[in-house]
Amino acid sequence: MAVLPTSGHPHSYLITGGASGLGSATVDAVERYGGTPLVIDKNPPSRDIAHVCANLADTEAVEKAVAELADVAGGSFEGVFTAAGIDSCGKLEDVPAAQWEEVLRVNLIGTAAVVRAALPYVRAGRGRIVTCASTLGIKAVSDATAYCASKFGVVGFTRALAAELAGDVGVTLLIPGGMDTPFFDGRSAQYRPPSTARLAKPEQIAEMVLSAFAQPAGCELRELVVCSSEEASWP
């Protein structure tokens, strides 16, 4: 069980993609353990949570959203989790260039933009950063060039960031396998998990995010590969 740090005031956790899927599960977990979630998402959360609607592909909008939520939090974040992500399945030559590039802008550039903007507030809160990659960030598959490129990028970005911030801000790379979330909704049948697929529950992965946030000063969970015990994408 995660135990979030306490210091006599509510701790605030910035979560991208917090309106659905893993992000929403992490919002619930933060509240369950006594923290205050703050959400950036292109869609509003289904319940009353402090949030700003923004497209992570728009760096200027991201910077404004982070600053606005930092004001709500009193100028500090105890944690940042970059859960937002999109995909555009298909062979490279079949995916329109604009869609392909949007995946990289949201998943990779958006992750970096959020972390860059949030870093002063994370330092102020002596907080931690958890980025979200994927098992497809360490194992490539066909018809996923945009997603794999973006998530391999998140892996490299986070490893470099951890080295850059060592001893200053804790950084954890989360590498989840397939999850039972709306992420697969709207895909053609060939790109959806089969009915027999063993997918992790987002609530389980969210617990691991909070475990990273809850580590004592000087102790880092550098990388977490978390998936169903029968996950097909890893190893």
What are these regions (language model features)?
Residues 83-88:
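Conserved NAD(P)H cofactor-binding loop of Rossmann-fold oxidoreductase domains
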Residues 120, 162-164:
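Alpha-helical segment proximal to the catalytic Tyr-Lys
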Residues 19-20:
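Conserved glycine-rich cofactor-binding loop
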Residues 115, 150:
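Active-site helix of classical SDR
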Residues 134:
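Residue(s) in the substrate-gating loop at a strand-loop-helix junction
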Residues 91-92, 96-101:
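Substrate-binding pocket helix/loop in short-chain dehydrogenase/reductase
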Residues 167, 173-174, 193-234:
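C-terminal helical subdomain
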